[in-house]
Amino acid sequence: MRTWVIAVVALVGSGGAALAQDAAAGEQVLKRLCSPCHDVGPEAKIKLGPPLNGIDGRKAGTYEGFNYSPANKSSGITWNEQAFDKYIRAPMQEMPGTRMAFVGIKNDKDVADIWAYLNQFRPEGAKK
């Protein structure tokens, strides 16, 4: 009986555990949901949004040449997996005043996969 209780507690406690990330799946989700506004890779250009190369560790509102909203510039966010996860689910709620008019991505796997894909790229667009 004690073993079952421990197993159930371990199972319930792991609900917030990180999902396996699939960069190839993330590329497809990014192409479908993000590429109308964002670019990534060696030839990435500014579109409606900034390129997403080298996002891990970059301060929000700092991609050179992109006209960010005051909300982005003053957000104090440094992008990492946790900040991205929270923001991408509801950008306009997480950063009131952002120009990113996007309802967000609710699917946990899609969010994890997009991060895995983006995290492959250095600031200049080459893969790590």
What name fits each language-model region?
Residues 1-4:
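Positively charged n-region of N-terminal signal peptides that target proteins for export
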